[in-house]
Amino acid sequence: MIVALTGNDNNGAVADLAEELALLRVAAGNRVLLVCPEPCAYDPQLYDDLVIDASHNTTRDAASLAGAAVIVALLRHEDLEHRDHAALLARLRAASEANPGARVLVAVTHGRQPLTPHQTGCLLVFVAQLPGARLADTLVLDHDTYHSYHSALEADAYKTANVLCAPEVRHLYRQVFNTSRR
């Protein structure tokens, strides 16, 4: 499966999230290629999944988004009020038109403070402008590190002694790869 992550240009959190999702996938026993190549330029016999940072708004990234089974759009909370999302919306719409079978998940990062009502409204409007997209999760990103003060809310089935990342990232992982513990 190809999973492409995108966001506004120069959003370093996208590469970090791609790395964490790939790490979780490897920990689940899958072979994962974490690079930013042309989509489908990998041997599916060698890798189960391809996780791509497609956040640089290039022709290659557009092709990566168009070839993905799952597209994760990551927004920063400060982007919700202060940036124009027309370019990102256009890229996501073009990817959806090129690949109508792709699932589009939108996630937002915020610091220790929760989103304001205005930011929440902006986020919902952003998601509503993408046909078939859904809001996946909000991730706590503070000092360039994903972590959580919500871990007490995570189901016991998903808590382990050797967790690789924040509960929100593990929750997003389960949504992207449709996994569940039995």
Q: Which sequence ranges carry the predicted segments?
A:
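Glycine-rich phosphate-binding P-loop
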Residues: M1-L23
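Conserved beta-strand segments of the P-loop GTPase G domain that flank and frequently precede/overlap
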Residues: T6, V35, L50-A54, I71-H77, ...
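Post-Walker A helix-loop "phosphate-sensing" segment adjacent to the P-loop in P-loop NTPases
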Residues: L23-L34
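Switch II (G3) loop of P-loop NTPases
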Residues: V35-P37, D43-S64
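Inter-motif core of Ras-like GTPase G domains
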Residues: T58-D79
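Conserved C-terminal guanine-recognition region of P-loop GTPase G domains, centered on the G4
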Residues: R83-Q113
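Beta-strand-loop-alpha "switch" segments that mediate conformational coupling across diverse proteins
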Residues: H110-Y158
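NTP-binding/hydrolysis catalytic cores, primarily Walker-type P-loop NTPases
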Residues: S151-R182
